[in-house]
């Protein structure tokens, strides 16, 4: 099987949460408007309860759909039973946690919402997805995310991220094209 297809397949439940958050988000900010002693918001208005829930749910739904057709196309499964839930939750919630972590860091650095932070913006969600998935389902993670897959994901994700953000900007789902 093509390693590019394999890599993107494994990462789809981590790639889509931020798109779902942008499309279905809004409403109450996760940080409830709170600022830290540095005077900056914890996350800012761009990270909302509804967006976070939509992102995690979207990633899980996409992963469930993928899992239902994986065998037909000879692509890897995300497991079954509890492992399936843990893997998909790890990939999708971890993606959102990685993005939240980057937002937290950007606020501490005094960066405004939407400010570009090269490579951090493109890979924060990957690191979060990998970290949480490894914690929740280490055997599955180690079997699927081999060194070649990890390297390829790190190389192609910034390109895919930019492409998705430009589309999001063009359709009005994002305020910045990065």
From Swiss-Prot:
Pathway: Membrane lipid metabolism; glycerophospholipid metabolism. Keywords: Cell membrane, Lipid biosynthesis, Lipid metabolism, Magnesium, Membrane, Phospholipid biosynthesis, Phospholipid metabolism, Transferase, Transmembrane, Transmembrane helix. One of its GO terms (cellular component) is plasma membrane. Pfam families: CarS-like. Its EC number is 2.7.7.67. It comes from the Archaea. The chain crosses the membrane at residues 53-73, 85-105, 117-137, 140-160. Its cofactor is Mg(2+). GO terms for biological process: glycerophospholipid biosynthetic process. GO terms for molecular function: CDP-2,3-bis-(O-geranylgeranyl)-sn-glycerol synthase activity. This is CDP-archaeol synthase. It comes from Methanothrix thermoacetophila (strain DSM 6194 / JCM 14653 / NBRC 101360 / PT). The gene is carS.
């Amino acid at each position: 099987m093509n390693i590019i297809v394999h890599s993107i397949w494994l990462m789809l439940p981590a790639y889509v949460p931020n798109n779902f958050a942008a499309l279905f988000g809004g409403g109450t900010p996760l940080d409830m408007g709170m600022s830290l002693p540095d005077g900056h918001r914890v996350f800012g208005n761009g990270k909302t309860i509804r967006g976070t829930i939509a992102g995690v749910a979207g990633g899980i739904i996409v992963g469930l759909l993928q899992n239902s057709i994986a065998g037909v196309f000879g692509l890897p499964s995300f497991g079954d039973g509890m492992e399936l839930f843990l893997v998909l939750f790890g990939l999708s919630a971890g993606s959102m946690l990685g993005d939240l972590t980057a937002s937290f860091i950007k606020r501490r650095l005094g960066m405004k919402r939407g400010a570009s932070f090269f490579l951090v913006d493109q890979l924060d969600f990957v690191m979060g997805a990998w970290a949480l998935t490894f914690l929740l389902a280490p055997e599955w993670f180690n079997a699927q995310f081999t060194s070649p897959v990890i390297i390829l994901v790190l190389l192609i994700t910034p390109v895919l991220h930019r492409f998705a953000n430009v589309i999001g900007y063009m359709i009005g789902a994002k305020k910045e094209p990065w």
